[in-house]
Amino acid sequence: MVLEHARIGDMQGLREIWNNGGTTLGGWVSLASPVTAEVTARAGFDYVCIDTQHGAVEYSDVVAMIPAIELGGGRPIARAPWNEPGIIGKLLDAGAHGVIIPMVNTVEEARAAVRACRYAPDGARSSGPTLVQMRTDRPYFDWAHDNVACIPMIETVQAVENIDAILAVPGIDAIYVGPSDLSISLGLGPGNHDESAAFTDALDLISAACARAGVVAGIHSTGALTPDRLRRGYRMVTATGDLQAMKFGLSTELAQARGESSGAESSMY
């Protein structure tokens, strides 16, 4: 029933929003649950990302979760486990509107990411939209050309040093900062380190480079940190995820039931 009613052409695409100067706020799903995916979308996020890198999600789960997100009014994207064309192609064939691709550190790796996301002549993606073609009246080849978003991750010092060259690769729609891995690469340990000038300077350098190149700057965040990231020029910001919201909500409700202050804070992981 979900497949019957979820249609990939029924909403404005992420690329169209970005091309019109818009900002997108997203949710993150790490649990293998179409219900969780749909609930996250119904909360009102512009996109919902299914995490197949660090989440507990297999491909068969992705196939069910993508139409659930669309049914909830969201735009499904997925994070690939690695910059590997077969995996990226399968996520797109399942109906993802875009793919976040980890650990893109060089121009060569950025070109590989684009090739995996694009059909010829712009790339080398294999054509076989067996699943996704059922959910659009438009030829999927044409829809993908106009809508699929290629989103390499910037999460190391090496990637920051190469940021201008990476952004110059044709076919990149947005980049996505992984703040925890970036912090580790900076020698700060995992997490957000807004107290460190090295960390915030890197965030500002990335967003400024994106503005110059006309590429959307994206970042993993928390609800509390999202206003700061927007102020720094990030236009694709993931504000929370299913596990984080569940942990925060359960802790808060339990504290209220006990008549206590929870002291709970939202987190990225």
Feature map (PLM): residue ranges:
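Expand to "…catalyze enediolate/carbanion chemistry for C-C bond making/breaking, isomerization
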Residues: 1-269
